[in-house]
Structure formats: structure tokens, C-alpha cells
């Protein structure tokens, strides 16, 4: 009787594994409608495009949450969205209007510079191709392994030409998306390994800071 909303929080930056169960948003919506209460879904990372086409596991998108009937959806402006740090809330007008009337709204709202930056990022999403090209986190996710390997080899050549007394080579590695997103994902990648000879790591770091 006292329940005012059903909240589903997506585990965007962690995973619970083993004998676990979770309720899908599509299962919650009919229950909420039956009791005339809203469904709120916190997606965390705020994905707007399907990442599966870039070799990652499926991450729920904002569009999917809305299509499944969520009344309010919350997600981050940074992380996988690729914009400034901010919290974004979208949903049905009557619930958004209620939030606007809350006394905390003025204290929690973003400044004009953040709003302007967020607007520019969201405009990139008018075309998925443009978003993948211009938003750094998406561009890095979509970069083919061959291109990463090419850049790593180029970096190895540059470092070797500096005369640095070290063993420098390209190695295979696994990368994570980071930023509190897709915690179990491992992407095949390439790294440059540097093993200094006759100098400490600190000395090598200082030398590299002055490379041109």
C-alpha cells in the first residue's frame, strides 16, 4: 500500500555472478500498471547505440528501456555516453514536472557550461556514424585491432629512435572499457612494453617526459 514506485537498477559497473536472478523491466511494467505506480530504471552508463556490433556484449540502451515501458529512465552524461559529468533523467512529463517542483532541483541542476557541452555531444548522436567518429570513447571502442597494432608499432619505432637504453616491443594484451562500464568485458588489444636497462623506472619516466 505504501509503495510509490518500482525501481530497477542496472549493474553497469559491477556484476553479480553465480546463482542469481533478476527481474526484467518488461516484467516490472505490467505489475506497476496493475497497481498504478511508475517504473523507474537507472541504466548507469547511458548507452545510446548498440555496442554488440563492435564486439561487446549487449548493454541495455536508453531507447530499449523506454520501449519496454519505463516511466522514468536515469543515466550518466559521461561514461559510455561520452559527454560531461552529469546525471540525466528522462521520462513522462507528469513525473518530470513533479521532480522540477522538488526543492533540491536548484541545488542539483547542472550549470550552463555543462548543459551546453551536453547538448553538443547529444547532437553528435543524430547520426550514429558521426557519434562513433567524434566521441572519443566510442571511437576507441570501434577502432579495429589492426589500427591499434599499427599505432603501437609506430610508437615503438619512435621510442627506439630516441636512443633510450631499454628493450622496447609491442605485446598483446587485453583492455577494459573502464569508466565504470562493462566490468567483465575484455577487448583484445596491443600495448608497448618498455624494460629499461641500467636506469630506474622513475629515471625512464623522467626521460620520456622530455621526448619530442
PLM regions with names:
Residues 15, 105, 139-146, 195:
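Generic amphipathic alpha-helical segments used as scaffolds and interaction surfaces in large
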Residues 38, 44-52, 78-91, 132-143, ...:
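Short, charge-rich amphipathic segments
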Residues 94, 110-159, 173, 183:
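Structural motif of enzymes handling amino- and sulfur-group chemistry
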Residues 24, 61, 144, 178-180, ...:
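Helix N-terminus capping/helix-initiation residues
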Residues 1-125, 159-160, 204:
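Conserved PLP-enzyme active-site core in the AAT-like
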